[in-house]
A protein has these predicted regions:
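Hydrophobic, aromatic-enriched alpha-helical segments typical of multi-pass transmembrane helices
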Residues: 2-273
Length: 273
């Protein structure tokens, strides 16, 4: 009687059973526009919270343009706040990316190339946000580490801290290009999708224009930039983004009748053929 020895590779190992419940849950999220919209709204709200804290509360308390001693003194006196600001900038960037990806899934059926452009613009803005956080953290180190004062002198260390926060300040202005530009494809997709009121898409596009005008004024006409900023850089962008956040959170998307569904690009091509 012969005995056949089977190698481990000959022994069939049963494949793990697919987790149908998990996949069904994922499909339900992707196929539910209202749920996707509310997720996007929640993520967008976090962008506003962390970005508002970092740029609206922390940065202005630290940075005094042209005054190295005052800037370094603010950083030293509020070192813990600066650390919170750095973390807030990083979280702002992370939630911004997740917001764009969720909106991409929600709106890519309208025009995928435009939705991709929206995500790319957000990715560029996020990269600048994170790089700015590095400069802010390094300013904290220069202002609080005595080795820098020993190497450069107190005045020199203060000047380096101011330089780093100058770079962060103007980096934030440059990031505004992409903060503004991403609202243009978002507004277009919102306008064309039928999922949102058309006025909301129009206001988002107007906000993109306002962001860019405000930025150009800051670089090309700094003497009037501070004068026009409260009228150009704040009202329309604030109305547009706050309206979008609350529409996503509260309403989600409009309920579209079956005969009003927006066809995907592939469906439009087939229909034309």
């Amino acid at each position: 009687m012969s005995t056949t020895v089977r190698s481990p590779s000959d022994i069939a190992v049963p494949a793990p059973a697919p987790n149908h419940q998990t996949r069904a849950g994922e499909r339900e999220i992707v196929n539910s526009p209202k749920r996707l919209a509310r997720i996007a709204g929640l993520l967008y709200l976090f962008v506003g919270i962390f970005g508002g804290f970092a740029e609206g509360f922390v940065d202005p308390r630290m940075y005094v343009a042209g005054d190295a001693a005052a800037t370094a003194g603010n950083v030293v006196a509020n070192a813990g706040v600066v650390r919170l600001g750095v973390v807030a900038h990083l979280l702002d960037g992370a939630f911004f990316i997740f917001t764009a990806l969720t909106l991409f899934i929600l709106l890519k059926h309208v025009q995928q190339s435009v939705a991709r452009a929206m995500v790319i613009l957000v990715a560029l803005a996020t990269g600048i946000i994170c790089l700015n956080a590095v400069f802010q953290f390094e300013a904290l180190r220069v202002a609080t580490d005595s080795s820098y004062a020993a190497a450069f002198g107190i005045a020199g260390a203060n000047a380096v801290a101011l330089l780093l926060l100058d770079i962060q300040h103007y980096g934030t202005l440059i990031a505004q290009v992409f903060f503004g530009l991403w609202l243009a494809p978002l507004g277009y997709l919102a306008y064309k999708s039928g999922l949102f009121p058309r006025w909301l898409g129009v206001v988002l596009i107007m906000a993109a224009v306002c962001y860019l005008v405000d930025l150009l004024a800051a670089f090309l006409a700094p003497d009037i930039a501070a004068t026009i900023h409260p009228f150009v850089g704040i009202p329309v962008p604030a109305i547009a983004e706050i309206s979008m956040v609350f529409y996503l959170l509260i309403i989600g998307v409009k309920t579209i009748k079956p005969d009003q569904n927006v066809a995907s690009p592939d469906e439009r091509i087939l229909a034309a053929a």
